[in-house]
């Protein structure tokens, strides 16, 4: 399996389960939304299955965008080393990687 395919598998599993394997963050803009909107956005992130080449050039499923209640929402997975000080040297290796999922309003990017 290529690294890109393994990274995609790990990203999809992390994003869909939203438990273990990393951290989840939401920006101030998302946190300021009413709880039902936050919950709906989280479900959309978990169920996201549209990865056009322009958003996902390496096929790793590490970025997504969608509209919710008239606002553009982005989500992004970044890869850090276990100390979370530097980027991961090998995002395909869970022992060397902490995944961080950030959910944000597009205008916060």
Each model region followed by its residue ranges:
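Compact soluble domain cores
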Residues: 2-67
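Short, compact, well-ordered microdomains
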Residues: 62-109
